[in-house]
């Protein structure tokens, strides 16, 4: 993990993103940090200008709640997963649906783009992971191995691997370089409940958040657990590494967001300004803003000010 000195937190409310017609289930920043994407129980995907908070568009099409949304790494596309058993691929510039990916038999709970933006993984209540070709919309592979619903996923930024988390309390790492990845995966065990969220760091560490109220940080290459973070009093809903890997943010159902020191495992800050349930959290690409989503149908941005000894002028 990064051995640098963590910056200090200066917490303040920056702005709200309202106008959702239902609970906010997911949020994601565009790679350049200029746009915020939110998915709602009202079945719509919303696009916001980060700086001003202006609503750019509200996109319908799904016939059920939007459970998850994510930008492609190249910033040209985003994907939305829904209870209607489909994944929709959207063009960012035109705010237009390009294709609907069908194949899941039950609600789709998670989607992830490969680092080159050419493939998309989806998983859900049918216990299956589907790997799609983004350009054609064709399903490339079907990954089977979890014993229960798949709730989370993320691609490794350093190797051609996909991590998936499930209600079976395990994290599976799929080596997509293998011809038959369905039988070529490793399982990370240690949680005692649903793996609700996964997040890779830039260097390839993997964090997993669970309904067992804990967060684990793993080194997937050796299947080793590096550190366990305890402090949430209810389920962990969302996690995010800061770009410098010094901090990890976690959002829970306990009306709070926590910020952790990844090296020591110490909780640096507990942010209690979130109304109702904290659903999601994310850092902007520059690490300056933490976003938390709440069931009160708003988005809240919280600023991060760096005052580390390495940067005394900030």
Swiss-Prot record:
Q: Which PANTHER family does the annotation name?
A: WD REPEAT DOMAIN 5B, WD40 REPEAT PROTEIN
Q: Where is this region: Disordered?
A: 294-314
**SUPFAM superfamilies reported for this sequence:** WD40 repeat-like
WD repeat coordinates: 19-58, 61-100, 103-142, 145-184, 190-228, 231-272, 274-312
What PROSITE patterns does its record include? Answer: WD_REPEATS_1, WD_REPEATS_2, WD_REPEATS_REGION
An individual GO BP term: hematopoietic progenitor cell differentiation
Q: What single Pfam family name could you report for this chain, choosing any that match?
A: WD40
The signal peptide here is: none
| Protein name (record) | WD repeat-containing protein 38
Q: List keywords of the entry alphabetically.
A: Repeat, WD repeat
Q: Name one GO cellular component term.
A: transferase complex
């Amino acid at each position: 993990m990064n051995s640098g000195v963590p910056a200090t937190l200066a917490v303040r409310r920056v702005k709200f993103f309202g106008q959702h017609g239902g609970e906010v289930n997911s949020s994601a920043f565009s790679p350049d940090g200029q746009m915020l994407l939110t998915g709602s129980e009202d079945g719509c995907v919303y696009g916001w200008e980060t700086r001003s908070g202006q609503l750019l568009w509200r996109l319908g099409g799904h016939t059920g709640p939007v459970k998850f949304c994510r930008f492609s790494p190249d910033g040209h596309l985003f994907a939305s997963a829904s209870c209607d058993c489909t994944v929709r691929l959207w063009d960012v510039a035109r705010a237009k649906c390009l294709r609907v990916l069908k194949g899941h038999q039950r609600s789709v709970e998670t989607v992830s783009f490969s680092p080159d933006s050419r493939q998309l993984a989806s998983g859900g209540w049918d216990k299956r992971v589907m790997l799609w070709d983004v350009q054609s919309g064709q399903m490339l592979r079907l990954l089977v191995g979890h014993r229960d619903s798949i709730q989370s996923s993320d691609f490794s930024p350093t190797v051609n691997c996909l991590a998936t988390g499930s209600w079976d309390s395990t994290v599976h790492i799929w080596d997509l370089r293998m011809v038959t990845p369905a039988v070529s995966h490793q399982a990370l065990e240690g949680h005692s409940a649903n793996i609700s969220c996964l997040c890779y760091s830039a260097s390839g560490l993997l964090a997993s958040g669970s309904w067992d109220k804990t967060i684990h940080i793993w080194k997937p290459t050796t299947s080793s657990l590096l550190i366990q973070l305890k402090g949430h009093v209810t389920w962990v809903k969302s996690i995010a590494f800061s770009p410098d890997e010094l901090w990890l943010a976690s959002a829970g159902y306990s009306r709070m967001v926590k910020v952790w020191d990844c090296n020591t495992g110490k909780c640096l800050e507990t942010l209690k300004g979130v109304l109702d349930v904290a659903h999601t959290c994310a850092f902007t690409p520059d690490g300056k803003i933490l976003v938390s989503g709440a069931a009160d149908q708003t988005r809240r941005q919280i600023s991060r000010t760096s005052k580390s000894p390495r940067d005394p002028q900030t």
